[in-house]
A protein has these predicted regions:
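Active-site loop/oxyanion-hole signature of alpha/beta-hydrolase fold enzymes
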Residues: 30, 34, 43-82
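Conserved alpha/beta-hydrolase catalytic His-Asp/Glu region
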Residues: 132-177
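Alpha/beta-hydrolase fold catalytic core
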Residues: 1-17, 37-40, 76
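Alpha/beta-hydrolase active-site loop signature
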Residues: 23, 47-51, 112
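Gly/Ala-rich beta-loop-alpha elbow adjacent to hydrolase catalytic centers
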Residues: 83-87, 91
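Active-site glycine-rich loops that stabilize anionic/oxyanionic intermediates
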Residues: 21-24, 85
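Flexible "cap/lid" loop of the alpha/beta hydrolase fold
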Residues: 92-96, 103-135
C-alpha cells in the first residue's frame, strides 16, 4: 500500500485525500494538510515510485488509481480528493472508475486531456547526476545548475535526493517515471 500521513481527527466533515504530482511527494502538501485539518481529517500520500512508497515498473494512471482505491477502501468511507498534476490525472481515473469512493473531486494544474509533455530530459538529468560522490545537497545543486537553469525546478527535484552515510539515493523510481 502507499505511504500515507494523516493530519487532524475524524469529524462529521468528509476526509480529504491529497494526491501529489510528478516528481513530488506527500511532503509537498504537509503544511497545507496541517493548516486545513482543524475541522476534518486530511490524508497525504506518496504515490507509487515517489517518496516512501513502493516502486513498480507500471506507472500508469490506471494502476495509480487502483492504489488510491485501496487507500480509500481502508478508510471505510468516501473521501474528497484533491489531485495535483499527475495526481490529478490518477484521481480523475479513480473517480470515473469508482464514483462511490469519491465525494468531491478537486483537480489542480492539469486538464482531462492527453498531453505531449515529455519528462525524459529531466529524468535523464537526474539519472546522470553522480549522486554516489555527494556529501551535501548543495553540491548536487551546483552540478545540476550546469544543465538545469531553473532554480525552483532544481530545488523541487533535489527534495527527492537523499544524502546519507548509508548511501545516497533518489526517492523517485526514475526508470519507471
Amino acid at each position: 500500500m502507499l505511504k500515507i500521513q494523516t493530519f487532524g481527527n475524524k469529524t462529521h466533515i468528509t476526509d480529504l485525500l491529497i494526491v501529489h504530482g510528478l516528481f513530488g511527494s506527500g511532503r509537498n502538501w504537509r503544511a497545507i494538510a496541517r493548516n486545513i485539518s482543524s475541522d476534518r481529517q486530511v490524508h497525504v500520500v506518496d504515490m507509487r515510485n515517489h517518496g516512501e512508497s513502493f516502486w513498480n515498473a507500471d506507472n500508469s494512471y490506471e494502476s495509480m488509481a487502483e492504489d488510491l482505491k485501496k487507500i480509500i477502501t481502508s478508510l471505510k468511507s468516501p473521501v474528497d480528493v484533491l489531485g495535483h498534476s499527475m495526481g490529478g490525472k490518477a484521481s480523475m481515473v479513480l473517480a470515473i472508475n469508482n464514483p462511490d469512493l469519491v465525494n468531491r473531486l478537486l483537480i489542480v494544474d492539469i486538464a482531462p486531456t492527453k498531453y505531449q509533455h515529455d519528462q525524459s530530459i529531466n529524468i535523464s538529468i537526474m539519472k546522470n547526476l553522480p549522486i554516489d560522490d555527494l556529501t551535501r545537497r548543495s553540491d548536487a545543486d551546483l552540478i545540476l545548475k550546469k544543465t538545469l537553469s531553473d532554480d525552483a525546478l532544481r530545488a523541487f527535484f533535489l527534495q527527492s535526493l537523499i544524502i546519507s552515510p548509508n548511501g545516497n539515493s533518489w526517492q523517485l523510481n526514475l526508470d519507471a517515471l
